[in-house]
Amino acid sequence: MPVAVIESLDHEGRGVAHVDGKVVFVEGALAGEQVEYTVYRQRPSYDLAEATRIIKASAQRVRPRCEHFGVCGGCSMQHLDSVAQAAAKQRVLEDALWHVGKVRPDIIYAAIHGPSWGYRYRARIGVRVVPKKGGVLIGFHERRSSYIADMRSCPILPPHVSGMLPALHELVGGLSIADRLPQIEIAIGDTAIVLVFRNLLPLTPADEARLAAFAGEHGVQVWLQPGAPATAHPLHPKGAAPLAYTLPEFDVAMAFQPTDFTQVNIDINRLLIRRSLQLLDPRPGERIADLFCGLGNFSLPIARCGATVVGVEGSESLVRRAAKNARRNGLHGRSEFHAANLFEATEDSLAALGRLDKLLIDPPREGAIAVVKALSTLQSPARIVYVSCNPATLARDAAVLVHEKGYVLRGAGIANMFPQTSHVESIALFERN
């Protein structure tokens, strides 16, 4: 069995070693460890491997809390201390900024920490009927596989939701369409839990009765989604209050649909908004754009600070809900929302937004390359706060801002939005030089 000394962790939380002149990425290994490993895939310049025995363990290694860790693909870093996880993610961010963007921040912000367990307020879990494995399987996908890990508990889900998993197995197993129900989406607000069942066939009256009884017994709302996300609708109870989460620091309540995009970690979301607005420093009289604004997660706190906010989002339905949230919170007088494809942004389309003193960008994993390239003398805000869920595209966009558009990267840091996983959420501040 080959042996390696692990030098560092990569962006997926794998140990990195060099053996006989070749890079080996070792799952389950930590920096500083000596491990035995098995190669499961070979490439000309690197191997992919899995640790089979830890010969010399890192002081940062901890016992995984979940019985499914190592099989389930939902988590990849439960074997690493939570503080060390954040430090590893900070290194991933700094490495990306330098190696991809050739930029370094003036300062590194302290990592934003929150609860390490029970934090996941949004999840999509798979459902499969596999008689050879005992019937219904419910869980995240297995590591490196399209198969479903059969989860009976999950410590990154809130305890009440994790505790429902055994009953959920029994419920699905009794439905007539169990083999035509590929996923269940979990969406949690401050006061309500919604389970959205993706049903590929209509339910029978008996199925609906079982689902309604489950909803009543467990204190959740059950929705059905027979088609695209827009088809999702409540089954039981009818007429329940909409899901919502609050941002108490800004006296804002955000209503949302269970299939809308919201951050999975409400505690980190609140802290990330606080950090973002500290850096953005919105003031009365300023006009600030929130690009990729979604439901108005950043827009409404900006407006609450007295600035006028212009929210832009690709989804027309989200734009309507953002405007509705602004009205509900009494902020419609300082906010406006527009639907536009920001992946096709141009100098003219940005200029059409009017004077912008500052900019907040919170794009999906693809980043905001069209937006940063479209910045010009027509639209050149003095300060940009960039919230990112992908260090590589943040670094790519930072290169354009710094090397082509005349901005300075004042600071950058991570928010541990997804503890126990390798996902890196980050924030960066750019100022016009």
Swiss-Prot record:
Keyword Protein transport among record annotations: no
Active site: 389
EC class: transferase
Keywords attached to this entry: 4Fe-4S, Iron, Iron-sulfur, Metal-binding, Methyltransferase, rRNA processing, S-adenosyl-L-methionine, Transferase
EC numbers, comma separated: 2.1.1.190
One GO process term, biological-process aspect: rRNA base methylation
CDD domains: AdoMet_MTases
Amino acids binding S-adenosyl-L-methionine: 263, 292, 297, 313, 341, 362
Entry similarity comment: Belongs to the class I-like SAM-binding methyltransferase superfamily. RNA M5U methyltransferase family. RlmD subfamily.
Name this polypeptide is given: 23S rRNA (uracil(1939)-C(5))-methyltransferase RlmD
Organism for this UniProt entry: Aromatoleum aromaticum (strain DSM 19018 / LMG 30748 / EbN1)
